[in-house]
Amino acid sequence: YAEATQADAKKVGIKVNLKNVDYNVIDGIARKGEFDLVISNVLTLQAGDPEVFMNGYLKTGQEQNGSGYSNPKFDALSDKLGVEFDPAKRRELIIEMQKLILDDAASLVFGYPQTNMVSNKSIANAEILPCDYYWLTKDIKSAN
């Protein structure tokens, strides 16, 4: 995505210098403000509920909030979400939080990379799950 962003920016007269860094230092660079644009990826949505992701990456003061995004209204909605258990009400809160993220341009979503899992006929039950963890499960076994 970085190279594509660089190429697109060049088309409109913006020079982009790319700096590849180890994933372990990205959040630190972001927290220190040592960037103009950080491209990082997060693939895991552990349970199909975005609360963990939204709070961790977008709530004010959270360690993983490397962007420095801060919006008191988002934080208040996040606090409400943390104590709300009714699925319909949680959905409403999440939608409102997502609208704030979009309106504030807090995050740019480039897409979702295609992932492939390849095995030969000696392996059975190898399948990709809807999150990036647990690809190797108790169900994967020798086909023999």
Positions of the model-derived regions?
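Bilobed "Venus flytrap"/periplasmic-binding protein-like clamshell domains
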Residues: 1-6
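Periplasmic binding protein-like
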Residues: 7-58, 94
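Conserved C-terminal helix/tail region of periplasmic/extracytoplasmic solute-binding proteins
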Residues: 10, 16-17, 82-83, 88-95, ...
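Generic alpha-helical secondary structure signal
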Residues: 24, 52, 72-76, 87-88
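Short, solvent-exposed loop/beta-turn-alpha elements that line the ligand-binding surface or hinge
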Residues: 29-34, 55-83, 112-144
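Bilobed periplasmic-binding protein-like "clamshell/Venus-flytrap" ligand-binding domains
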Residues: 34, 38-41, 85-121
